[in-house]
Amino acid sequence: MLRMATLASGSSGNCAVVSDGRVHILIDAGISTRRIAQGLKGLGLELRHITGVLITHEHSDHVAALPVLCRQCGAALFTAEGTAFALCARWPGLEERFRVFAPGQRFALGEWEIGTFATSHDCACPAGFSVEDGRRKLALCTDTGYVTPQARAGVRGAHTLIGEFNYDPQMLRTGPYPRQLQARIAGD
């Protein structure tokens, strides 16, 4: 049975684990590799057990651990082409680790089928994911300004839906962001 555990969620870092006891993946790696390893240990896992890392987008709170994680773990990185391009520009040398997809594409990862869908966020090519093991479907959608038609279709039929969005109107108004960015975040 598919199980999901959140290791971190929020502006300071995002990382989740999906496992069925045989296949283990991370969704995003926005916290330190040390924190990821500690979280995995609490689940009875180690970094070496990770089969792959699904990356939603290139913002630091979703990918901060990638360079170190890639050195310590042999897992492939699955992300949209635009996101892979942005990450390779930031961290040359990761190119061979990426398995790229176009949002809407499906692919196999172990015995699972991974679905991908476009989300709405201010980055190169943001994506959400569904994970299916033949019996259950889990879907994850993060940092999206609104639910795109593709996201709606991608999460349809999910037994478990994880949404990660943090938005505080008061923090936004009083924070350091310029007005134009505040308007975009607020959906104006």
What are these regions (language model features)?
Residues 1-43, 127-143, 160:
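Conserved beta-strand hairpin/beta-sheet module of binuclear metal-dependent hydrolase folds
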Residues 5-16, 52-66, 71, 84, ...:
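Structured catalytic core of nucleotide-sugar glycosyltransferases
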Residues 80-135:
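Metallo-beta-lactamase
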Residues 27-30, 50-58, 78-81, 139-143, ...:
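Active-site neighborhood of phospho(di)ester-bond hydrolases with catalytic His/Asp-centered motifs
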Residues 149-188:
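Cap/insert and terminal regions of metallo-dependent hydrolase folds
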Residues 33-79:
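Active-site metal-binding motif and surrounding structural segment of the metallo-beta-lactamase
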Residues 140-152:
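Active-site glycine- and acidic-residue-rich loops that bind
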Residues 50, 95, 158-159:
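Short, well-ordered alpha-helix to beta-strand connector turns
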